[in-house]
């Protein structure tokens, strides 16, 4: 139900989503605006048939100004897409060809305070490192963890599991879909309840 717009210049935001159509159809509906930055990474992690479990670290590069902009508000979020050279090694319960996870502005500020962003020697941009982990046990699910420069989980860095209901994220949000982000952001702002009452 949101309209997506792409800012004309490199402002640190890739996509702005607005509920303009819903406001026209329901004049009493509160306006919603969400801003997204999208980053991608590639990995070749896979789980060997005779050796269950896997782990890989992926890195995303952001300008200091991008982090500052995103960390200002919960209605801004960083979406990280990880593509894999190895077919099906990162598929979730819905056979997705890649893993995607998000961190909203509040969580970005929290992990930043915990040392999540660091600058490598000779690089102008900040590095955000995330580990993709698959437990060794039979029923384990892939999950993403934000880590510091030494590879240790930062406060708030556990994002829950992909395609599973157990072991939720530290904030109990679904960090692996756009729908999960919108649901979480709206529940925190109280917009969801207002929108439901207007569309009934």
Regions found by a protein language model. Name each.
Residues 1-11, 17-200:
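Mixed-charge (Asp/Glu-Lys/Arg
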């Amino acid at each position: 139900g949101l309209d997506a717009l792409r800012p004309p210049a490199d402002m640190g935001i890739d996509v702005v989503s607005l509920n303009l159509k819903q406001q026209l159809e329901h004049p009493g509906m509160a306006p919603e605006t969400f801003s997204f930055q999208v980053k991608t990474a590639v990995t070749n992690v896979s789980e060997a048939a005779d050796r269950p479990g896997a782990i890989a670290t992926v890195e995303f590069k952001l300008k200091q100004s991008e982090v500052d902009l995103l960390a200002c508000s919960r209605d801004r979020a960083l979406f990280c897409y990880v593509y894999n050279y190895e077919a099906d090694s990162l598929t979730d319960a819905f056979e997705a060809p890649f893993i995607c996870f998000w961190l909203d502005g509040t969580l970005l500020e929290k992990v930043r305070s915990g040392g999540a962003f660091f600058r490598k020697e000779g690089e102008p941009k900040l590095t955000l490192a995330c580990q993709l982990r698959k437990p060794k046990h039979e029923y384990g699910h892939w999950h993403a963890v934000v880590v510091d420069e030494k590879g240790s989980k930062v406060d708030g860095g556990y994002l829950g599991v992909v395609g599973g209901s157990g072991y939720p994220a530290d904030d109990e949000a679904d960090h692996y879909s756009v729908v999960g982000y919108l649901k979480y952001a709206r529940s925190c702002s109280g917009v969801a309840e207002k929108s439901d009452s207007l569309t009934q």
